[in-house]
Amino acid sequence: MTQVTFKHNPVTLVGTERKVGDKAPNFTVVNRDLEEVTLHDYDGKVRLISVVPSIDTSVCSTQTRKFNEEASNLDNTVVLTISVDLPFAQKKWCAAEGLPNAITLSDHRDLSFGEAYGVIMKELRLLARSVFVVNAVGEIVYTEVVPEGSDHPNYEAAIEAAKKA
């Protein structure tokens, strides 16, 4: 299991660690309108899954904005930003940041995504900063769990993986 720190304190990741080549497991999260959304809702598309501890922090905000801007140039690709923030907070953030079309999804109900992808920080009940790219046929082609929660992911590597997927 990947070792992760949050604010330089070790945290325990819970769930099933995912690797390149794994079939991407389905999950159920909630969108800003409180509707259930699953990974399968985006079958046939490349899915760049950007995972943030809380959308309303500087690194998480930058991560969400950067992936949405970069991926807008990619064909057949959708960016899904997932956190445990309440859908209301995600909606407010998108409006304030001028990103009304960003897809923000909340895993607050039962941590379905976090469990399926092994990124629940047990001590904090937050998701570890991470990125997964799932190709159009449902195979994980890129994973990154950022070792320190306050650091940025490798944006270039994730976008390149999405381009090749």
UniProtKB/Swiss-Prot annotation:
MF GO annotations: thioredoxin peroxidase activity
Domain of life: Bacteria
InterPro entries: Redoxin, Thioredoxin-like_sf, Thioredoxin_domain, TPX, Tpx_CS, Tpx_Peroxidase_subfamily
This protein's record includes keyword Transferase: no
Stored CDD domains: PRX_Atyp2cys
Catalysis: reaction(s): a hydroperoxide + [thioredoxin]-dithiol = an alcohol + [thioredoxin]-disulfide + H2O
Domain Thioredoxin: 18-164
Disulfide bonds: 60-94
EC number: 1.11.1.24
Catalytic residues, chain numbering: 60 (cysteine sulfenic acid (-soh) intermediate)
Keyword Oxidoreductase carried by entry: yes
Pfam families linked: Redoxin
Keyword terms, alphabetized: Antioxidant, Disulfide bond, Oxidoreductase, Peroxidase, Redox-active center
Role summary: Thiol-specific peroxidase that catalyzes the reduction of hydrogen peroxide and organic hydroperoxides to water and alcohols, respectively. Plays a role in cell protection against oxidative stress by detoxifying peroxides.
UniProt xrefs under PANTHER family: THIOL PEROXIDASE
NCBIfam families associated with the record: PRK00522.1
Family label: Belongs to the peroxiredoxin family. Tpx subfamily.
Subunit comment: Homodimer.
Note in the entry: The active site is a conserved redox-active cysteine residue, the peroxidatic cysteine (C(P)), which makes the nucleophilic attack on the peroxide substrate. The peroxide oxidizes the C(P)-SH to cysteine sulfenic acid (C(P)-SOH), which then reacts with another cysteine residue, the resolving cysteine (C(R)), to form a disulfide bridge. The disulfide is subsequently reduced by an appropriate electron donor to complete the catalytic cycle. In this atypical 2-Cys peroxiredoxin, C(R) is present in the same subunit to form an intramolecular disulfide.
The name this protein goes by in its record: Thiol peroxidase
Organism, as annotated: Listeria monocytogenes serovar 1/2a (strain ATCC BAA-679 / EGD-e)
